[in-house]
Amino acid sequence: MNEYLLDANVLVRFLVQDDAKQSAAATALFEKADRREIALHLDGLAVAEAVYVLIGRYGLARSDVANVLLAIVQNAGVETAEAGMVADALQRFAAANVDFADAWLAARAAVIGHPVASFDRDFDKFKDIRRFEPKT
């Protein structure tokens, strides 16, 4: 079985369907994965880039972006590295007004149990993690 690592541009084409040729190819790729003819691998970095593009370039709402990407992460035909943490980051991103990188770090902090060293008070929005503010 062939295996492929997904780039954000394939995710975006599959989700927005704005380029006839590339969108059709991306859709066919996901359909093959659904039928288990190929294996698709998804990394959190590609998810982060897709979030950035879908919101910044296409103006989609953060909750919509989180929901469609979460559906891909949970798709049985897609193997997502650290799927639980990626899903948690997407849920945090949808629920709180933070950027995806902060949601990712909050999800990581929840898994490893360490505070996040940051001056950014956005981390205080998450009650299950702690923020450490460096001082002199």
PLM regions and their residue ranges:
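Acidic, PIN/NYN-like endoribonuclease modules and their adjacent C-terminal/linker elements
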Residues: 3, 75, 106-136
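Acidic active-site catalytic centers that drive phospho-/nucleotidyl reactions
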Residues: 7, 102, 120
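Amphipathic alpha-helical segments within well-ordered protein domains
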Residues: 51-55, 70-73, 90
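Active-site neighborhoods of divalent-metal-dependent phosphate/nucleic-acid chemistry enzymes
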Residues: 76-117
